Amino acid sequence: MQKEAVGCQTSLHNINQEDITVLTSKMIKDAAIAAGADKCGIAPMSRFKGAPDEMNPQFLFPEAKSCIGFVFRIPRGVQRGIEEGTQFYQYPSMAYGGINEIFAPAVLYQVGKLIEDEGYEAFVYRNTGARGVVSDMDGSPGNTLSPEEQIEINENAKTSTAHHRSVQFTRPTREGNVAPDLQFQFRLAAVACGLGEIGWSKMLLTPEFGPLQRVAFLFTDAELEYDEMYHGKPLCRKCGACVRECPGSCIPAIHSGKTISVDLDGKLCEWGDIDMWRCYAFYTHAGRFYNPFVPKEVWDANENGALDLMEGVTDVANEQEIMKVYTALQKYFPSWVGYNMAKCGGCIRACVSMLEKKGGCMEGRFEAPLRTKKAWKLDR
């Protein structure tokens, strides 16, 4: 046994140094693109310093040195059915479910294998929701309903909580830890990785795709070459198109003073203080004038005030009002996609339409613009 060990040691000394690979940022980015990502950026973990503990990814993997962000484009054509008012299934199915559940995890898996083959750990983090110790919607303590987990709430076997769990409870596993499952702000993490900026509508904007993408992340203890945060021409034009075309008036006016500001390692990120609960209701159910699946009579009747939020009877937008809306309207959507029932996309389509105009980051990307006629609105 001793001789074998010596022999092994000798052979290691004889290895050609050129055969030893060193994990690089380029290797990771090349692997990400080859696996199907559209863009990849890398940030040092130090950029997350100062984030609230319950949303700080540094707690996920304390030894991690690098955060790797991946962009997955939403094909503009996925929005075409809603833009024309003729097909509403493809957007939630492909742009939400397809990317978050299939395409992104596959890339995380492949890039993670590359990193671990080089001797470093790969902590993959796909999109999820309704798992943290604070609300996805307003950041308040405790779990609340989340559109990322909204699936057949009345028919699901575990409907006793918004989580689809029988009991909502979580606690730190050791002193100094945060309670599981820790979630962080994906869009700010993407900014940290140099992938883009936050627009007024709180959407992540990238120079290549405007608002048309989703993201996923990977954390590793490998020290890599890092990307600078975006510092080019502002991607958001502050044009107010997203404000005007939101059917629920969820986005404040540009000059309203209603803003959220975050200092991300010296970069100021600012967006409109969106009414997230109201947005939840309208982006999944669109409202009287933009949901062709719900009969006019249902809106008119507004039984038991279930649609007060959608009809403007109340300004109160919270979890209870959302549940009323879902209970009243979910049966009118023809089929589920195993994900939330996004039917709006008003802010995204408005943003694309403006960014495709002269001076926008999407100018010249397509032969023809997304919007070729006046946006539709039901007459009722």
Regions found by a protein language model. Name each.
Residues 51, 97-356, 363-372:
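Catalytic cores of enzyme domains
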Residues 60-61, 143, 375-380:
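Short alpha-helix boundary/capping motifs
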Residues 4-6:
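Acidic, Ala/Val/Gly-enriched low-complexity intrinsically disordered segments
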Residues 8, 12-111, 144:
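Non-catalytic, usually N-terminal nucleic-acid engagement modules in DNA/RNA processing proteins
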Residues 79-83, 91-92, 358-380:
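C-terminal, charged low-complexity interaction regions
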